[in-house]
Regions:
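Sequence/structural signature of beta-propeller domains
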Residues: 1-145, 151, 157-160
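Sequence context surrounding c-type heme c attachment/ligation sites in exported
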Residues: 36-37, 54, 68-72, 80, ...
């Protein structure tokens, strides 16, 4: 680490490192994550050893080298080499390999209008399976993989294929492949590259960006939880031995833009797009719990915002009957210091309208 710049994220606990000598080509790399976050500063001792200062925990912790993994685990340079996607080399729509299980969440995450194909594998067919924790999040065994391919809705051209992986040593990491313009192949990216589709344009996330949202508190694998799958699909996966029984999970989300009750649809949309960070133990600011089952009080109903009121008089996180005074909705409308903070350049007009309609329908802060 000598000669390299190290910095940390107070909220997530992610520590990054980059080479300042690389100039504008410098790409931050995720060094490690301090459980619980709370990284306030760094210090060196007389031997040059590095320490992390944690404010709320009142702790000084030493950075020590991690043991080298027993087996190197690099990702292939080309998507076709992963074995997870069928790439015919002629520009046909890529499809997940037969060994992967396809799925569609009930309440999809907003990604600037891009369409997505999703699949996963426990990583050791016939032996390993996904477990389910008390929150209903599926927990992957070592070598488990989730994959998502983004397509441009205007011409169905593949733009990007992302992987989120639990490695053999138990660590998690995200990787992404950028599709070539001819759609014949995709190449491993470092992050920061521009995606220029016909109707969708955005910037590829870095591996550090992936870990900002894919946190332990939300089970790491966002979107893969019992509540995001219909009961028949859950039962089918359980019967096949792919996932453990989620019989204790009673929560199921609803399609945000379907015909269910307004409150349920808004709760599902917020759960999908916001609760990865805004939940107990998550990195979201404001001490909010935006999981679908959380109470209105936990979601910030009639609570003054802890960070910024955005210049709004008498602002609340959720102001019953007044979306124009509700910071929750106002953050969704912004393109800077916004919610969600990563993974999107444009706002979700339909999602904003849904949440504002729900807030407008509230007469008081009782579920």
């Amino acid at each position: 680490l000598r000669g390299r710049y190290i910095y940390g994220d107070y909220v997530t606990g992610n520590l990054f490192v980059f080479d300042p000598g690389a100039g504008t080509a410098a790409t931050p790399e995720l060094l490690t994550t301090v459980p619980g976050g709370d990284v306030a500063g760094f210090a060196e001792d007389r031997d040059g050893e590095l320490y992390v200062l944690r404010l709320a925990a009142s702790r000084i912790e030493k950075l020590t080298p991690a043991p080298a993994p027993a087996i190197a685990d690099p990702f292939p340079a080309r998507l076709s080499e992963t074995g997870c996607v069928v790439v015919d080399g002629r520009g046909a729509t890529p499809t997940p390999a037969p060994a992967l299980v396809r799925y569609t969440p009930i309440a999809p995450f907003w990604s600037d209008g891009a369409e997505k194909d999703r699949a996963f594998t426990p990583g050791n067919a016939g032996v390993a399976r996904l477990s389910v924790d008390g929150d209903g999040d599926y927990r992957f065994p070592a070598l488990g993989v989730a994959m998502k391919t983004f397509r441009d809705p205007a011409d169905q051209r593949p733009l990007e294929t992302r992987f989120f992986v639990r490695h053999a040593d138990g660590t998690h990491a995200g990787y992404t492949y950028l599709w070539r313009p001819d759609g014949h192949e995709a190449d491993l990216a470092r992050g920061g590259e521009a995606v220029l589709g016909t109707s969708v344009q955005y910037t590829l996330p870095s591996r550090g960006d992936c870990m900002t949202c894919h946190q332990e508190a939300a089970g790491y694998f966002l979107g893969l939880e019992a509540a995001q799958l219909t009961a028949p699909i859950r039962k089918s996966l359980e019967d096949q031995g792919i996932v453990a029984s989620a019989s204790t999970v009673t929560r199921t989300l609803v399609p945000p833009f379907g015909s269910d009750e307004l409150a349920l649809r808004a709760a599902s949309d917020l759960h999908s797009n916001c609760s990865g960070c805004h939940r107990p133990g998550g990195s979201g600011r404001g001490d909010l719990d935006l999981r679908a089952e959380a109470t209105l009080a936990a979601k910030g109903c009639d609570r003054r915002p802890e960070t910024s009121d955005l210049g709004v008089a008498d602002a609340r996180v959720i102001a019953p009957g007044a979306p124009e005074r509700s910071v929750l909705a106002l953050r969704m409308r912004r393109t800077e210091v916004r919610m969600p903070p990563l993974g999107s350049r444009t706002t979700d007009a339909a999602g904003i309208a849904l949440v504002e309609s729900w807030i407008g329908s509230l007469a008081r802060c009782s579920n």
